[in-house]
Design a protein with these regions (language model features):
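Iron-sulfur cluster-binding electron-transfer modules in prokaryotic oxidoreductases
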Residues: 1-226
Length: 226
């Protein structure tokens, strides 16, 4: 899953985007603690992260993680973060901007794919269209929707810290979602979340299913390199 932010960095560099990363100053956003009921432990992380971003003078924050996006855009204000003049975008939203600007030349990527909506990106943040716009912006890709998509999408099984509590629940839900993906006939399952990728990859290995799982940022990077 480390390949996801690495792919995004490669895409942004190729597009000529002026950006920086926090490196070692990037702390966890605190979302796993919040979902575990440890709200009081989130504040130090929030204060550190907000201060570092202000120090950089950044105007836009781009994250490849839907949980981080939800935390910065929804939870931090609720938890008392000071108002900051920073636009918070998920990577899929920023990729749409890059593709629409014409800053990238993409090669053909002939593949039938299906897309899994992450819970934190879709139902919780309302971001459904942008990942699909990215997918459809890659030449040669045919997108086939699963039975459950958008608001009706099944969880990958790995959200909400559930895997820490009961891995069997995660496995059962992931197996069901993988079955929905298989029925589309796609050989490539796309998502926009590192946890979804990890969980669905594990399900494919467990069930010996010959499908690949990839993030939309990795799709753009592959098409860019191709």
């Amino acid at each position: 899953v480390y390949g996801i932010p690495q792919a995004m960095v490669q895409v942004m560099e190729r597009a000529g985007v002026d950006f920086a990363t926090l490196g070692g100053d990037e702390w966890c956003c605190g979302y796993p603690l919040f979902t575990a009921g440890m709200e009081g432990l989130v504040a130090p992380l929030m204060e550190h992260n907000v201060a570092r971003l202000q120090d950089m003078g950044a105007k836009t924050l781009v994250t490849t993680c839907p949980s981080c996006h939800y935390t910065w855009s929804h939870l931090y204000p609720l938890l008392g973060a000071p108002p900051i003049d920073i636009e918070v975008l998920h990577a899929s939203q920023y990729l749409v901007r890059i593709l629409e600007s014409g800053q990238l030349r993409l090669g053909a990527f002939e593949q039938v794919v299906t897309y899994h909506d992450p819970c934190d990106l879709g139902r919780k943040s309302g971001i459904f269209d942008e990942p699909r716009q990215v997918i459809e912006g890659v030449p040669g890709v045919e997108l086939r929707e699963m039975d459950g998509s958008r608001e009706e999408a099944l969880c990958c099984g790995g959200g909400g810290d559930v895997q820490i509590v009961d891995e069997s629940v995660t496995a059962a839900v992931a197996d069901r979602r993988l079955g929905q993906a298989q029925r589309t006939g796609a050989r490539l399952v796309l998502s926009a979340c590192q946890q979804c990728k990890r969980t669905l990859m594990a399900a494919a290995r467990r069930n010996k299913v010959r499908v690949r799982v990839m993030d939309v940022a990795e799709l753009v990077w592959r098409a860019m390199e191709g």
